[in-house]
C-alpha cells in the first residue's frame, strides 16, 4: 500500500472517528447530565399571617410585566369573602397561565359553592426576564403556596392541576405535611416526564440557543391580540430546563398512607 493510499485511509478513519465520537462526547457531557439532573424534593412551609388577598397582591407586585388578568387571584363565592366548605386551588400547565381555564373553573366553583384560587407558576405570564433566573424549587413553592391559600379560603381543599401543574399537584399530595391539608386531588392530563426521543432532542437543542420564541395562540387558533398576555411566547432556556428538573425529580415519589380521593383524566394529546 502506497504512502498516499495509507494517508487517505487514515484520513477517512479519522473523519469517521470524529463523526462517531464527537456526538457521543456531546451526549455524555451535555445532554445526559441535563436529563438526569435532579433535586431533593422539599416543599417549603408557607405561612400566611395576613389578609390572604393582601398576601397575594404583595407577591405579584414583584412582576410588573404580568397582565392583571393573568395574575394569581382569588375568586370568592360571594361578596362576604368568607371561608366556604370547599375551596378549589388550580395549578395551570406549562407555557400557559390560569386564564385559559378560568371560565370553566369559575363554573365548577359556582356549582360547588366554593371559593377559587387560580395560581400562576413561576416564570409564566410575567415576561421574558422572569424566565431567566428560574429554579426548579420555585414550582414547588407555587404548589405549597396554593395549598396554603386554599386552606385560608376553604375548610376543605380541592387541589386541581393540569399538565405540568398536575405533576406538581401530585407531588404535593405525596408530601407528608401538605397531604394533610389536601382533601381532594384532581389531575387533568398530568405531565409525566420520561426519557424519550422528543425530550432527548429538546435537551440537546437547548444547548445551542438561550432565547426562544413561539406563537402559542396561533397553535390553538386563538387571536394574538387577545391571548398573547396569557402564554409564554418568549422564554429563556431555563424555563423548560427547570420545569423538567422539578417534575423529573418527583417521578419516583411514593404516596404515603393516605385517603385523599383522586380524580384523573388523561388526554391522548399528552402522550409523550
Residue ranges of model-derived segments:
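Short, surface-exposed "cap/lid" segments of acyl-processing enzymes
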Residues: 76-111
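Conserved alpha/beta-hydrolase
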Residues: 112-126
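The alpha/beta-hydrolase serine catalytic core
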Residues: 43-72, 190-256
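A conserved short beta-strand
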Residues: 180-190
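Catalytic nucleophile-loop/oxyanion-hole region of alpha/beta-hydrolase
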Residues: 126-153
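Conserved small/polar residues in nucleotide/adenosyl-binding loops
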Residues: 265-272
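N-terminal membrane-anchoring alpha-helices
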Residues: 4-52
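Gly/Ala-rich beta-loop-alpha elbow adjacent to hydrolase catalytic centers
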Residues: 161-165, 169
Amino acid at each position: 500500500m502506497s504512502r498516499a493510499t495509507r494517508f487517505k485511509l487514515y484520513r477517512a478513519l479519522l473523519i469517521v472517528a470524529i463523526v462517531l465520537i464527537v456526538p457521543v462526547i456531546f451526549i455524555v457531557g451535555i445532554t445526559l447530565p441535563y436529563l438526569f439532573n435532579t433535586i431533593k424534593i422539599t416543599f417549603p412551609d408557607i405561612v400566611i399571617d395576613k389578609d390572604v388577598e393582601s398576601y397575594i397582591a404583595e407577591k405579584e407586585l414583584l412582576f410588573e410585566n404580568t397582565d392583571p388578568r393573568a395574575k394569581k387571584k382569588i375568586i370568592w363565592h360571594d361578596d362576604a369573602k368568607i371561608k366556604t366548605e370547599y375551596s378549589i386551588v388550580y395549578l395551570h400547565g406549562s407555557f400557559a397561565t390560569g386564564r385559559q381555564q378560568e371560565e370553566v373553573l369559575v363554573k365548577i366553583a359556582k356549582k360547588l359553592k366554593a371559593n377559587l384560587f387560580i395560581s400562576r407558576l413561576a416564570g409564566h405570564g410575567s415576561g421574558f426576564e422572569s424566565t431567566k433566573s428560574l429554579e426548579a424549587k420555585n414550582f414547588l413553592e407555587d404548589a405549597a403556596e396554593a395549598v396554603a391559600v386554599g386552606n385560608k379560603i376553604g375548610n376543605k381543599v380541592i387541589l386541581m392541576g393540569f399538565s405540568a401543574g398536575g405533576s406538581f399537584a401530585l407531588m404535593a399530595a405525596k408530601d407528608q405535611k401538605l397531604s394533610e391539608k389536601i382533601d381532594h386531588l384532581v389531575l387533568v392530563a398530568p405531565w409525566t416526564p420520561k426519557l424519550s426521543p422528543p425530550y432527548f432532542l429538546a435537551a440537546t437543542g437547548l444547548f445551542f440557543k438561550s432565547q426562544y420564541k413561539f406563537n402559542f395562540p396561533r397553535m390553538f387558533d386563538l387571536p394574538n391580540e387577545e391571548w398573547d398576555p396569557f402564554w409564554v411566547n418568549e422564554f429563556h432556556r431555563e424555563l423548560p430546563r427547570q420545569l423538567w428538573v422539578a417534575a423529573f425529580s418527583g417521578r419516583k415519589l411514593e404516596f404515603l398512607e393516605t385517603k385523599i380521593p383522586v380524580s384523573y383524566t388523561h388526554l391522548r394529546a399528552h402522550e409523550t
